[in-house]
Amino acid sequence: MKHDIASSPGMSDLEKEVATNAFEAFKTGSYDESLKYLDNLQELNKEDYKITMNKTVTEFYKSGQTTSSTNKESAALKAEFTAMIEAAKSKMHQYKVRAYIQMKSLKACKREIKSVMNTSGNSAPSLFLKSNFEYLRGNYRKAVKLLNSSNIAEHPGPLKTGECVRCMFWNNLGCIHFAMGKHNLGLFYFKKALQENDHTCAQIGDGSNAQASKKFSGIPMCALLANKRYELLYNCGIQLLHIGRPLAAFECLMEAVQVYHSNPRLWLRLAECCITANKGSSEQETKGLPSKKGIVQAVVGQGYHRKIVLASQSTQNTIYSEAQSAAIPVASMEFAAICLRNALLLLPEHQQHDSKPDNGSKSYSQSGGTESGSETSDACSGKTQEGDKFIPAAPSSPLRKQEVENLRCSILACSAYVALALGDNLMALNHAEKLLHQAKLSGSLKFLGHLYAAEALISLDGISDAIAHLNPENVTDVSLGVSSSEQDQGSDKGDLEPVESSGKQTPLCYPSSVSSARATMLFNLGSAYCLRSEYEKARKCLHQAASMVNTKEIPPEAILLGVYLELQNGNTQLALQIIKRNQLLPSVKPGSSPDFRKKPLSFQSTQPVQPIQTPSSFTQVQRK
């Protein structure tokens, strides 16, 4: 502390006296008294910076020539950083769990889940992740219980975190009930999620005017990405497809594809909507059961001139109109062909040596967002291998190599079916042959591949090649395939509790057994023999097939084939009895009466029996 302020020019006698007293008190160590004098002096002369400097020196000596303010600030910062690091560790564990779930690595996910629960406790994000884990293992009831135990009311809300927990809660319930086969209930939950999402978007605003732009100023950037409408529409579309409402599903998926146009699965689902909407409204096609109304169209005339008019088996595209372009998004077979072409183009280049079948899957939203994408199984697939490349398929989880190959099989099967429906037999044959050349193919798709190839060949007058495809020995398996996720789950779980039943059933449109599939092959083989006028072989195939299945499972096309064979054999009365009883009857050989019947015009272009099965793979739900 300097005393030169006493000699400063312009100071009054009072100021000099106070300054002298302050200096004397400082020299004697009376720092408190010195500070009082300096305060009084500063009131007298507020513009002198030397007074402020002397006060600082006095305070420094008063504290023992040390200062603790920096240490206190450092300690506070250290505590703050420690809390931030702990929060970051918790977030990192959550992100690792989500990454393992996307990679379908349940073993690593199980270990990481424990770290999440230790660091985050029973917070909503941690419980959502654990529920997701149990959901992937097939423990659906436990997953629902964990979701219900989460206290979503404590979550800060979408305006602070960018995550609408209520929306994710309803979406996750919808995913779980989808996996349990309760599609109507799952659709209800998805609609609730859409309502919550719309409410959140209304809170944030759309930014279309100046007021909304000002409103965004206090909202974090992540909150602007809280809209999950298109993911939820994707989920709703898949649920509607399973319920049997393809047109409503088509509308939902068309909105989703505007955002996720690079997802090949989504294009396949759109094609399946078109196929289902155009399959026909007859009950026998939908349920696989014969109907007399599907055979007899009308009865005309009376008495001796009474005639039975048989129904035409040609299918018509009731959705598509010739006046509009096929590129217009309408649920038509023409648009289905475009969707399937897009799906094939979006798949990576085929690698035959390591191709693996695919399992489609439905992703599950976690604490970071609502991810969806319902997918289905079509063929068997293997376990995850190290080095697998993942193909992006937003909004669902990335596709592994075996999933890509299985997806390719499904697209090829649908493409062959659509090409046949459109009369493009060369393209149908091309797709069917590509399907049959896939390295790993499920029994059901192999069965369909042979049927579609045979039908295309018959239309191209390649009956001999078609007969080779229709050999019943080609059918040795009609399984829909085992998902890679189910295999992973089995290997990860070890001796843990068994997976509960999901409630899903094998779809009716697939053959229930190998014998049923071979019977369908024989029905079609009989049609092929008919075209070569080998009626005895056709009759043997027909009755052999009829003996392999229940009477109610015989398709109406097979009954019409039996009528045609009896007419060719001259057994008019037996043909009438087959129509009246709507079932095949033992053939009776006539006497030596000549066979004067010509081949009816309506049977000159007899097609193989249209398989009851459909290539659309959405009828079976499969997990990742």
From Swiss-Prot:
One GO BP: mRNA catabolic process
Keywords: Cytoplasm, Nucleus, RNA-mediated gene silencing, Transcription, Transcription regulation, Translation regulation
GO cellular component annotations of the record: CCR4-NOT complex; cytoplasm; nucleus
Compositionally biased intervals (Polar residues): 602-624
Family from the record: Belongs to the CNOT10 family.
Subunit structure: Component of the CCR4-NOT complex. cnot10 and cnot11 form a subcomplex docked to the cnot1 scaffold.
Name this polypeptide is given: CCR4-NOT transcription complex subunit 10
Species assigned in the record: Danio rerio
UniProt gene name: cnot10
